[in-house]
Amino acid sequence: MDSWLEYDDIINQDIDIPSNDLSGSGTLCVGVHSSLLENSLNSIDSFISSKEEISWCGNQSTPIATKSHLSCINPQYVNPFDTSPVSVDTEFQDTYLLDAPSFAQPHFSERQSVDKTRSRCLSRNRRRKRHPNLHKNHQRLLGMSFPQDGFRRMPAESVNFSYFRDTGFNEPTIFPSSDTQNTRQLNLSKIATLIGYDCPLALVDVVTQKQIPNKMDMESWVKYMSLEPSKRGRIYDVLSLEVSTTKLAYYVRKPNIVRDLDLVNTVWPPGSFALGEYPHVDTYCLMSAENSYTEFHIEFGGSSAYYNILDGCKIFYLIPGTSKNWEAYTAWLTSSNDSDKKFLPNMVDVCYCVEVHSQQTILVPSGWIYAVVTPCDTISIAGNFLTFLHIYPQLSIYNLELQLGIEKEYQYPYFESIMWYTAIHFYLAFPDNSSRDGIDDIIAEYETGRLFDINAFTEQELDGFEELLNYLYIRAQILRDCDIIIDIYNEPVKISKNNGYNSAYTMVPPDLDEICVDFVQKFGAWITYHHRRSAKHPSCNCFSHLQTKLIDSGPKPANNSYQHQSNFIGVVISTNHNIIKKCQESQIQTGKNNCSFQLVKKRIKSTKKAPSWRSIIKAFKKRENTRCNFLSSLHATTFREDIVVRPKIKSFVLEQLIFQALFSFAINWTPSFFLNHSNFENIALSKETFNFGGEANCENTDTTLFTTWGDQGFRPSDSICYNDFNLLETANSDAEASIHELELQPLNAVNEREVDISQTDMTPSTALDTRVDTRVDSLPEFSNLILSPSSNDDSFQLDDLLSPSSSNLKQQIQKVVPQNSLEFSVGEKEKKAAEYSLLHTFSYKRLSMENEKPDTTKVPLKYNIQHEEMKAYRRKNDLEYIDQHFASSKSGISNGRNNNKEVNLTKAENVGIKKRRIMKNENNIYDFEDHSPVREKWGHRLRSRGAS
């Protein structure tokens, strides 16, 4: 052995051998005289006792067959990436021709390699204590003792997906790098050839731990590493060289278990993945000089990490990822005290020291805190990956990064998008037993990767999904511009400026921002189904900590910057009957008679005085037997026994509370219609004339048709009031979700509408619309109306809306509403009604995320359209608008994007960029025909079909 090792330096030298000598049969020409080699064969054989030890042969070793005449082989003429097995003549003993590693001494067996490397590291560590260029914390670690780690060293075949699901992957795992390809022959010069000698490198100064971009190119780095460690001066480390897009990626790859667990490989859209549009953080080439040190850190985004040591050795100092240790890490990171007592290993309960050698791989779980010491020149392949096993620590670390103000470039790229895609993937891949609807049709258009081989989720995984639900619930509120953000535990959440609406809107998948609330509701129901128990969902009980804040804060002062206002205060995620029942039985719900629901509209700064709708009140409560029927056209329809909800513009129809005769004109009634109590009285009041109402200065093409009957023109107004309850729904909200159950607020905390007389034409008809004190005393039980469009499997009838004690109300309705909706006089009233057949009501346009903010407060303004003006308007635009309307609302023709899609009960249509959910119900007694209406003398009459 000793005589062989004397020639280590000779073996490392490059050898020039003529090509005609390659087939010779005299001596083995490797720069060593054949007599010396033959004398050393017996010593070599003593180290190779079994084929198991042969399999652990050191780096860059090539097995060859020895016969009576040894062939002359030059390692430089051997394909370094040829992985074909070499035939071994069993008649002779196996020997190894060693092309020694560039940065480490050659070794023959793993046992000897570990012992030699460890002894070499210890001898060097003694000298490093006096090394002037070592990092100060590196010197501290050399003087400390650490307990022996209990981490498992496993064979490669045992490291699989099932093992990590069973164990939870909560501890580091070390195993031989048997599934890596072509890495035994890689050295620094070959890596430089594959990635290019002109490739710029970002170096890390080990002493200062600061990254220096473009400090060297690859050619300069090769020259730097060729120097003796004592002659290099400052110590540099290469940690951020991502090589997944270089030729080196063909010769290195992630371990199989990493590919199986990586969420990017699974949930990221395959189309984008194939185009290379995905987070590139999974394949780094680390080239560390001797004495390199990486400070204690947690991987960005709480991601897990793998290190495959190609050549050399690394020492890991590992601290378990617990909440207590995270707090200690945060305190150490923000502390200015640099004493030994404030050194992180002294602030935690335990710190492990693990050595990883050549051709070994270590997996570090999410949330673990660790530092890395490189005792000798080392090349390794490393990467980061997110898993569904560690959703809780990943989200915790991501939030910690935001609190510490970590810059975006040092965070996990597209982290929030991956969380959205993860929820979509598992929701589609492992469906629950709920019925599918239009939201599912939209979600199903997202591409997902391969499926996990999972029969049932573990408790750790389901707890992670609950944490993911909480995170997405908060992000959905941000996308809806809520002033007050709460989590699913009803606790307020503080959102930093750099993580607000702009960030949420950028990271949400395409079109999901329009249905984010509905999807979060469905994902909560999905968790409940798979958890076999009720998950913690937000409920309407979360008003207690918001009530005082809303009262104390008062109206926000106007300033030059746009203020994001809330479209709703709280969203109820409860599609499970048990959760709805608990919400009904809660103590807060029992005190609803003293409270009202508040919905704050989005406000835009104004330089002019205009009426402000600061308070939008609704008196709905949730109920277990709730069903929502959605309109079968874009504008109008009628129903016989149901409440109809229009989620896109939040309009609804209360059957038997509106004149049935008017439905023949295809009216889409908004909740504001109910302000005028005269609308609920006898039909004989038709002589009283109401002017049309609309909303001026709006910038949206989403319109709603209103028609009149006789001299009576019905206009959208503000609310329907009874005692301390106001019912108001916003037809102009930009919220794409359907009506949600909102926070309870005392009525006296609601600011009344302010009406500027100078800006409003105060005719007798408009005066009716500005009466906030209007009461509908004839509807004593109207506050019992309930609505929950998000509950897809719930249903209710009109009788369920009314309590048993409201028989008088039923009698009043029967007196007011004709039993036959077609019983109305056709004559002069109908002719005049045709003259008022069109009226556009507009919706607020969603504000863009650009810096240019409107400087005008856009609120609904009441205005009068005289008879002659409306007549001229009708003559010009009626035919064109009606034809366009019917072309977009035909039940048999789908949108241009989906003209090849056949839909039976549910279909998703694209309107512009947004998708609208339209459900068809067989109980509709009026609907549009499949062709445009016939033009008659007095205008256009919308014919109904299916009337009964």
UniProtKB/Swiss-Prot annotation:
**What cofactor requirement does the entry state?**
Fe(2+)
Q: Which residues form the signal peptide?
A: none
Chain's gene name: jhd1
* GO CC aspect terms: heterochromatin; heterochromatin island; mating-type region heterochromatin; nucleus; pericentric heterochromatin; subtelomeric heterochromatin
Q: What keywords were assigned to this record?
A: Chromatin regulator, Dioxygenase, Iron, Metal-binding, Nucleus, Oxidoreductase, Transcription, Transcription regulation
Q: What is its EC number?
A: 1.14.11.27
Q: What is this protein called?
A: Putative JmjC domain-containing histone demethylation protein 1
Where is it chiefly localized?
Answer: nucleus
Q: Pfam families annotated for this entry?
A: JHD, JmjC
Species whose genome carries this gene: Schizosaccharomyces pombe (strain 972 / ATCC 24843) (Fission yeast)
GO biological processes: chromatin remodeling; heterochromatin boundary formation; regulation of regulatory ncRNA-mediated heterochromatin formation; regulation of siRNA-independent facultative heterochromatin formation; regulation of transcription by RNA polymerase II
Residue sites binding substrate per the record:
T294, K314
Q: Where in the cell is it found?
A: Nucleus
Which SUPFAM superfamilies does its entry note? Clavaminate synthase-like (SSF51197)
Q: SMART domains, alphabetically?
A: JmjC
Record-linked InterPro entries: JHD, JHDM1_Histone_Demethylase, JmjC_dom
Q: What is the superkingdom listed in this entry's lineage?
A: Eukaryota
Q: What is known of its domains?
A: The JmjC domain mediates the demethylation activity.
What job does the chain carry out? May be a histone demethylase that specifically demethylates 'Lys-36' of histone H3, thereby playing a central role in histone code. Represses transcriptional silencing by negatively affecting heterochromatin stability.
Q: Name one GO molecular function term.
A: histone H3K36me/H3K36me2 demethylase activity
The cofactor remark states: Binds 1 Fe(2+) ion per subunit.
